[in-house]
Amino acid sequence: MTTSTSTSSVSTLNRECLCTTINPAALERELAAALGDNELYRSIRATRPHLFSATAVFVTPGQVDKMRAVIEAIETVIATPTYRSAALARASSAAAHDPHSPGVFLGYDFHLGEHGPRLIEINTNAGGALLNVYLARAQKACCQEMHGLTTGPVALAALEEEFVAMFRSEWRAARGELPLARIAIVDDAPATQYLYPEFVLFQALFRRHGIDAQIADPAELEIRNGRLLHADGTVDLVYNRLTDFALEEPAHAVLRTAWFDDLALITPHPHAHALYADKRNLIPLTDPEWLSTTGAEPVVIETLLQGIARTRLVERAHAETLWAERKRLFFKPAGGFGSKAVYRGDKLTRRVWEEILAGEYVAQELVPPGERQVQIETETTAMDGGSAGREAVPTGTNAGAVLRPTAMDGGSAGDAGAVLQSTALKYDVRCFVYAGKVQLLAARLYQGQATNFRTPGGGFAPVFYPPVNEASFTDGGSAGNEGAVFRPPAGETE
């Protein structure tokens, strides 16, 4: 692959490169180096076999540049008083409180189709950044085309430092030069969360940088003498992984008080969610007439209209029109997250449609995700007459095949009774962003109508592209940023 990589050549790689790029031994070493043992790696393999895909996704520098342009255009509009007053007016009371910090780990999720990248949604508690750092470091070059590729504008070796600096920047923005001594990583029943391994990795990362860190359920927090406490120790900063974005649930009352009374810095926070992640924000961001009232330049408006899936509010007054157009629409709850209660219009029943009309939903233009061809190991049965000696099963129906969850260990086609099935998985690309600057790109491979971690061969995957025009992608980048370039791990064959 050359620096003039075209969309067609990248599509060919995503369609025809069936190589396994993950190096399980390297991933085990990365996680063991972070934690001091390999227990986390073993736990992930045993309990989360579809967390990591065994393959990578390829994109072009042009696609990356377009995603960056959309992100910058959104930041430009969000900075305007017109936008901010409109977004906060429809948000919860908690959102009105401004901590004067941007909030860590915004996730801009894109579908990459034939008409270029289109933004689907923005998340303010985007998970997976640190997991994807270790995953990207554990890749091996499967072919000559992979040489010289990068996974983002920041060098992989520098990303952990970048993330810690981000939290320190949040702290300084709100607290000045006061020392940041203790962080609580907070979620409901954290040990049961699918991304709990990332909590453990962040805890270790903070501690390596001289910051005490604890993983806590909100019920373990208390307020005493004007301080937020966990296990009798003062909490300076809460790394908030909750999906109660307005801190409205009774179980989060202590955090809500700490938020309003500035007893601790909470990030990501309700203010950022109201400005970025409420899906109703995508309505004005794809309305040219409204955008013109913000004072945005024509080039900014055009970038948004081309780069964001058009979004409308679901209202009973327009129910008949929306129902007629439903096959071209995707319906999402305005304050939702992930795949919870989302529906493809062509799958809707009248009963579900009535539930949508009774709730707060947006209707978004259906933008198909990209596709990545992968090989998954299957066990043949008498139904397909298969044998262990067959090299591959053609793409198509899985009749008679039992999928084997081998994504994380790269598969083992030599197992008795196993063959390789070629199948197409969908993918989206997530840009992890802080203060308007992209830190890392990652993909999620899946089957079904929305991303999940239940698909054999699916899960997080690194995104590779030639490092062209890095200087325009981030303030700290340059075309000669050798630290960001993908190279095979030392001692590994290609």
Q: What would you call each of these model-derived segments?
A:
Residues 1-494:
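Preference for protein termini
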